UniProtKB/Swiss-Prot annotation:
Cysteines engaged in disulfide bonds, as pairs: none
Residue sites binding [4Fe-4S] cluster per the record: 350, 411, 414
Reactions performed catalytically: (2R,3S)-3-isopropylmalate = (2S)-2-isopropylmalate
InterPro entries membership: 3-IsopropMal_deHydase_lsu (IPR004430), Acnase/IPM_dHydase_lsu_aba_1/3 (IPR015931), Acoase/IPM_deHydtase_lsu_aba (IPR001030), Aconitase_4Fe-4S_BS (IPR018136), Aconitase_4Fe-4S_dom (IPR036008), IPM_dehydratase_rel_enz (IPR050067), IPMI_cat (IPR033941)
EC number per UniProt: 4.2.1.33
Enzyme class: lyase
GO biological process, alphabetically ordered: L-leucine biosynthetic process
Superkingdom assignment: Bacteria
SUPFAM superfamilies, per database record: Aconitase iron-sulfur domain (SSF53732)
Name used for this protein in its record: 3-isopropylmalate dehydratase large subunit
Stored NCBIfam families: leuC, PRK05478.1, PRK12466.1
Signal peptide: none
UniProt organism field: Hydrogenovibrio crunogenus (strain DSM 25203 / XCL-2)
Length: 474
């Protein structure tokens, strides 16, 4: 039998039927639902007089439109569209008998945080959600990707999808990361090297010592941004860290089922001689803290670097892109990254709103204050359970004493779909995943960074190398 990649194994184990043209009917083990991309899917079921094929294979939670300030019920949501979408999710899940972690449930939160922490996401599964950052769940060795609303309906009705197999890509990062360099820096550095189209048509497996050493939450950060590298799927092989992370979670297998599951998961890794269509290798020890300066995640630099000069770019198309980005971002060519001012700070999103992210940011902020020039600094937990754990550890007090606002769970300022928005012309140090024009608010200027780098920028009022602050504290 020929050697297989992890992606090959996950794909092959879920093929129901394969056609001569290469398309295949794939079985989907789990679907996660939220309020934005599910209403039309449920309406499609009603119009066709269908019921979900497997009710227990679906889990819903509102996240995109949920206010992060204190409120008592769905009816208190001020924006009428947001309120209707959340109310509609409540009504649809109730009608079709689907489990929902709704407003007021401590388990409510960002769908890509909730799935793994509840054990809903398991190694070896196929998992979809009507959200492009579903690749996050690949950190647990699951074949996970985003789908459109019509496909959400297909999965509800049939538990299957028609797919074409992707190519295999390996991003191998060896060596040891420097202190102060985080998983977010790793994935931004990868995107900076291969570009936002580097993974087009591929499922990316992240391998090498850096990812073996990385925590599961760190792997989630990396897989979360596989889509920003052009790939729908990001994967990390299952190891003992994966098994320990899943063990004991509410939806994880129990007793004999657990033993059988762990035995089945042992092969969820690429075979030694497996073929990858594309291989990228990097030295993790050379990765520096990253800051995006432009309007695409590939427009990124080391914190001690400079904004590029389009005059030095031989490719006219790239030069034009740099000029447009500099104009939108209000930056000058050759400007030092550390000279870029920071008006707002956002620590949160499905990329960086887990407990480890908050511990790292709080370690930077402890005993320090947010600069007076920073107009607003937000910390938004990825779920009610993350919020509760952070408060039990006293992290909320560190953030509040530093001058941050400690909020309730939700997608928040990652995207301009709720009350948390970045004003026009303002620069934001953000731990989210996208920085295109208007992503956080019309005219807003987003700089993608790690939680530590966001915390350091909040204190300084501009971008700084967090490693310098770490040295001061030691």
């Amino acid at each position: 039998m020929s050697a297989k990649t992890l992606y090959d194994k996950l794909w092959d184990s879920h093929v129901v039927r394969e056609e001569e043209d290469g398309t295949a009917l794939i079985y989907i083990d789990r679907q996660l639902l939220h309020e934005v991309t599910s209403p039309q899917a449920f309406e499609g079921l009603r119009l066709a007089n269908r019921k979900p094929w497997r009710i227990d294979a679906n889990l819903a939670t509102p996240d995109h439109n949920v206010p992060t300030t204190a409120f008592n019920s769905v009816e208190d949501i001020v924006d009428p569209i947001s309120r209707i979408q959340v109310q509609t999710l409540d009504a649809n899940t109730k009608q079709f008998g689907i489990t929902e972690f709704g407003i007021g449930d401590v388990r409510q939160g960002i769908v890509h945080v909730v799935g793994p922490e509840e054990g809903v996401t398991l190694p070896g599964m196929t998992l979809v959600c009507g959200d492009s950052h579903t690749a996050t769940h690949g950190a647990l060795g699951a074949l996970a990707h985003g789908v459109g609303t019509s496909e959400v309906e297909h999965v509800l009705a049939t538990q299957c999808l028609i797919q074409k197999k992707m190519k295999n890509m390996l991003v191998k990062v060896d060596g040891k990361l420097q202190p102060g360099v985080s998983p977010k820096d790793v994935v931004l550095a990868i995107i900076g090297q291969i570009g936002t189209a580097g993974g087009n048509g591929h499922a990316i497996e992240f391998g090498g010592q850096v990812f073996r050493d990385m925590s599961i939450e760190g792997r989630m950060t990396v897989c979360n941004m596989a889509i920003e590298a052009g790939a729908r799927v990001g994967l990390v092989a299952v190891d003992e860290k994966t098994v320990e992370y899943v063990k004991g979670r509410p939806f994880a297998p129990k007793a004999e089922d657990w033993d059988a599951a762990v035995a089945a998961w042992q092969d969820l890794k690429s075979d030694d001689n497996a073929h990858f269509d594309k291989v990228v290798e990097m030295d993790g020890s050379k990765i520096e803290p990253q800051v995006s300066w432009g309007t695409s995640p590939e427009m990124v630099s080391d914190v001690n670097g400079k904004v590029p000069n389009p005059a030095h770019e031989s490719d006219d198309v790239k030069a034009g892109g740099i000029r447009r980005a500099l104009e939108y971002m209000g930056l000058e060519a050759d400007m030092a990254i550390t000279d870029i001012p920071v008006d707002y700070v956002f620590i949160g999103s499905c990329t960086n709103s887990r407990i480890e992210d908050f511990r790292e940011a709080a370690a930077v902020l402890k005993g320090r204050k947010v600069a007076s020039s920073v107009e607003q600094a937000l910390v938004v937990p990825g779920s009610g359970l993350v919020k509760r754990q952070a408060e039990e550890e006293g992290l909320d007090k560190i953030f509040i004493e530093a001058g941050f606002e400690w909020r309730n769970p939700g997608c928040s300022m990652c995207l301009a779909m709720n009350a948390d928005r970045l004003p026009s012309g303002k620069h934001c140090a953000s731990t989210s995943n996208r920085n295109f024009e208007g992503r956080q608010g019309a005219g807003g200027r987003t700089h993608l960074v790690s939680p530590q780098m966001a915390a350091a920028a909040a204190v300084a009022g501009h971008f700084v190398d967090v490693r310098d602050m770490m040295k001061e504290a030691s």
